[in-house]
């Protein structure tokens, strides 16, 4: 088992927590990001800046039983289909049922924006989200560690 981080848009605290918990539970942590991001990690993979390049590399590295951290619902859907447990940076565990609803919501919002509508941007990250993420990731790693 390994922990895969879609590090392109990953909050710093999520990245720090993931690396720390990976060390504590002796789980290899792979970070994948475009060359625009500098990440200090023993297993950091740098990809080009083309669209979806990070997602493709994460998919290629993923194996059933792995855990992935991403806020990309499309990537999470593909990883779930591959038998990977997916966690969002807010600590939300994505499953097959929930990811379908999230993808549908994303499509509706994109259609609304294409039609000239405006949607709210993301809220500022909170300490509560950091705690929730750390707790959720620790729970997943404990389950794996048995």
Curated annotation (Swiss-Prot):
Pfam families in the record: DUF188 (PF02639)
InterPro entries on file: UPF0178
Family to which the UniProt record says this protein belongs: Belongs to the UPF0178 family.
HAMAP family on file: UPF0178
Protein name per Swiss-Prot or TrEMBL: UPF0178 protein Helmi_09130
